[in-house]
Amino acid sequence: MRRSIESVIESWATKDASRPLLIRGARRVGKTYAAEEIGRRIAGDAFIKLDFQTDLELIAPLFDCPTDDVDTIVARISDYKRTPIRKETAFILFDEVQLCERALNSLRFFSGSGWRICATGSQLGVATRKRKLPFPSGVRQETMHPMSFEEFLWALDEGQMADAVRTHAGTLETYAAHQAALSLFHR
């Protein structure tokens, strides 16, 4: 399933990963799916995922060190995953990072470190009100929304219709497949 955010993640990962990428959005909109898809495609076996939702008790201690010591954090992640992690190839995903305040805080120290760190978070606004540490600066933030009509058309393999709807949306021209598009919209 193709999502618009994927091009943002891919561009960040291949051209400008100097700052960690934090993908915000409501629960269950596909943040993890999109980040994993791109991470696995770009990094292959060097893709590392830390899932704070399911493994919080195991992962949180990895951040029980100064949060500005990113090399120690990565070394601990490497030990936890039992795999070497190389800066040049790794794509590290912190999934549902808001559940671990120290992990969320560490993001700002990964900025400029050379590590490619992507994080996802839902309910970040709620989580940040309860925080003892400041919200991380130096992090690129993107918001992911529920599936758009264009993404819905892509999922149905209706790419040509998606392009035509986008083209005609800003004009007063009639669209030959308007009824078909409307029918899909109401589906």
Residue ranges and their predicted role:
Residues S111-K132:
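Sensor-1/coupling segment of RecA-like P-loop NTPase cores
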Residues I23:
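Hydrophobic anchor at the beta1->P-loop junction of P-loop NTPases
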Residues P84-A103:
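Conserved P-loop NTPase "ATPase switch" module shared by AAA+ and STAND
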Residues K31:
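Conserved lysine of the Walker
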Residues M1-D16:
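Pre-Walker A adenine-sensing motif
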Residues T54-K87:
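Short glycine-rich substrate-engagement loop in P-loop NTPases that contacts/grips substrate
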Residues T128-R187:
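Interdomain motor-coupling "hinge/lid" segment immediately C-terminal to the ATP-binding subdomain
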Residues A34, I38:
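Hydrophobic positions on the alpha1 helix immediately C-terminal to the Walker A/P-loop
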